Amino acid sequence: MVVAVGLYTDIGKKTRDLLYKDYNTHQKFCLTTSSPNGVAITAAGTRKNESIFGELHTQIKNKKLTVDVKANSESDLLTTITVDEFGTPGLKSIINLVVPDQRSGKLEFQYLHEYAGVNASVGLNSNPMVNLSGAFGSKALSVGVDVSFDTATSDFTKYNAALSLTSPDLIASLHLNNHGDTLVASYYHLVKNHSGTAVGAELSHSMSRNESTLIFGSQHSLDPHTTIKTRFNNYGMASALVQHEWRPKSFVTISGDVDTKAIEKSTKVGLSLVLKH
């Protein structure tokens, strides 16, 4: 089955990845080892300012069943059980359990069809939060909604809507978020396919504050293993990164942020090292 639409979270994802993915101003190290029998173990550590955060992730795959167990340095334990093709093609079931905060556990279902993608989740507690999102249409045009309902207060805590237009080299999307208060328009343009050269922009406007944020971004592949990205917003914040794949699925990324209005005070540099064996 060919999936043309995807989920609601896929609307505008190309632009978000271009503008935000892999940018960081801290130090991160990640090591993943995997075995032929479907077991993968990932150890990660992140240093931000004077704080250090660690995480250990174990993943076990067996046919249509995937079990993920994550433990971190804050004594949280997250277990996720995913079953693909749950009873019918395109349907996926996901159970999330969190210790010690068991109230944040949830049961989730995802269904992907050629012309629709639906995600539904419900909290595993006495007064659960219920979320329903969906995207409908074709590869060229799709619309989506994202709604959350709090059964404890009988209130809709979230209702968002989105529209996406897609062509072979251009993607444009429009989001209405935060109960209709925030309007986000974005576009992504693939300039040269062979070099991965792309540009994008995102305009976000808050109606209640009457404030707008405009971000421009670009990316270009220097060679098959090295990518550079840049971005700049209307407040004078500039960022850049260089990412090099020095072996299959292993990356080193150096990125930096600077306030062009106060260069001597605001420069921040981040380093990320991801190793997969």
Curated annotation (Swiss-Prot):
Q: Which GO terms describe its cellular component?
A: mitochondrial membrane; mitochondrial outer membrane; plastid outer membrane; pore complex
Question: Per the record's keyword annotation, is Plastid included, yes or no?
Answer: yes
In terms of superkingdom, the source organism counts as Eukaryota
Q: An example of a Gene Ontology BP annotation on this entry?
A: monoatomic anion transport
- Which GO molecular function annotations are given, in alphabetical order? porin activity; voltage-gated monoatomic anion channel activity
| Principal place of residence | plastid
Q: Name the PROSITE patterns for this protein.
A: EUKARYOTIC_PORIN
Transmembrane as UniProt keyword: yes
Which UniProt key words apply to this protein?
Ion transport, Membrane, Plastid, Plastid outer membrane, Porin, Transmembrane, Transmembrane beta strand, Transport
Q: Where in the cell is it found?
A: Plastid outer membrane
Q: Write down the Pfam families for this protein, in alphabetical order.
A: Porin_3
Question: Which InterPro entries does the record match to this protein?
Answer: Porin_dom_sf, Porin_Euk, Porin_Euk/Tom40
Record function comment? Forms a channel through the cell membrane that allows diffusion of small hydrophilic molecules. The channel adopts an open conformation at low or zero membrane potential and a closed conformation at potentials above 30-40 mV. The open state has a weak anion selectivity whereas the closed state is cation-selective.
Q: What is known of its domains?
A: Consists mainly of membrane-spanning sided beta-sheets.
What protein family does this chain belong to? Belongs to the eukaryotic mitochondrial porin (TC 1.B.8.1) family.
- Protein name (Swiss-Prot/TrEMBL): Outer plastidial membrane protein porin
Its taxonomic path starts at: Eukaryota, Viridiplantae, Streptophyta, Embryophyta, Tracheophyta
